[in-house]
Curated annotation (Swiss-Prot):
Entry superkingdom: Bacteria
Protein name per Swiss-Prot or TrEMBL: Ribosome rescue factor SmrB
Listed HAMAP family: SmrB
NCBIfam families per record: PRK04946.1 (NF003432)
SMART domains according to UniProt: SMR (SM00463)
Protein source organism: Haemophilus ducreyi (strain 35000HP / ATCC 700724)
The entry's keywords: Endonuclease, Hydrolase, Nuclease, RNA-binding, rRNA-binding
Any Pfam family hit: Smr
Key word tRNA-binding present: no
Molecular functions (GO terms): RNA endonuclease activity; rRNA binding
GO annotation, biological process: rescue of stalled ribosome
Entry function: Acts as a ribosome collision sensor. Detects stalled/collided disomes (pairs of ribosomes where the leading ribosome is stalled and a second ribosome has collided with it) and endonucleolytically cleaves mRNA at the 5' boundary of the stalled ribosome. Stalled/collided disomes form a new interface (primarily via the 30S subunits) that binds SmrB. Cleaved mRNA becomes available for tmRNA ligation, leading to ribosomal subunit dissociation and rescue of stalled ribosomes.
PANTHER family: DNA ENDONUCLEASE SMRA-RELATED (PTHR35562), UPF0115 PROTEIN YFCN (PTHR35562:SF1)
Length: 177
């Protein structure tokens, strides 16, 4: 607690001083929430960039089962994916969506896999008119983060689903060392 004598001494010491006028400019910063929303929107736009409707990849289709393996990956990974050795941690249901909405959802799924460090995801295409079922693999093979895809085994959706492996930063390190 401040003594009466100390307070009087302080007041005499600062007698005649004036309050400093604030003349510095403080820049306005964008709130963190808006920055993260903007960054996520940009990432989603960047991801959608990879999904061209005109691209026709050479996909392996044996017995109506669609398969894809990136060139730098061990072929045994594709066999494991087809057997169901990988358990999907994220599921995306595209039933009833338009092509544009499905493309946006695919971009969001890949971003979510990267953010949550999910290696395997399942995409439910359904049977329907088969337009999405045929287009989804064509879009996925264009994305650099997609390692492999395979028609899902029965326990993960069978003919109506696709399992996809998404590259994670640490998985690349494990392969290199």
């Amino acid at each position: 607690m401040i003594e009466h004598d100390d307070l009087a001494l302080f007041r005499t010491a600062i007698k005649g001083t004036k309050k400093i006028k604030q003349d510095t400019f403080v820049p306005k910063t964008m709130p963190r929430k808006k920055v993260s929303e903007w960054r996520e929107t940009q990432q989603q736009k960047d991801t959608e960039f990879f999904f061209s409707d005109e691209y026709e990849p050479l996909l392996k289709e044996e017995n109506e089962k669609v398969k894809y393996l990136r060139a730098d990956i061990d072929p045994y990974i594709l066999k494991q994916l087809g057997r169901g050795d990988f358990q999907p941690d994220l599921f995306l249901d595209l039933h009833g969506l338009t092509r544009q909405k499905a493309k946006t959802e695919l971009a969001a799924l890949i971003l979510a896999c990267e953010r949550e460090q999910v290696y395997c995801a399942s995409i439910m295409t359904g049977y329907g008119t088969r337009t999405l079922k045929e287009q989804i693999p064509r879009w996925l093979v264009q994305h650099p983060k997609v390692i492999a895809l395979h028609q899902a085994p029965k326990q993960w959706g069978g003919d109506a689903a696709i399992l996809v492996l998404i590259e994670q930063p640490e998985s690349l390190e494990k392969r290199l060392f």
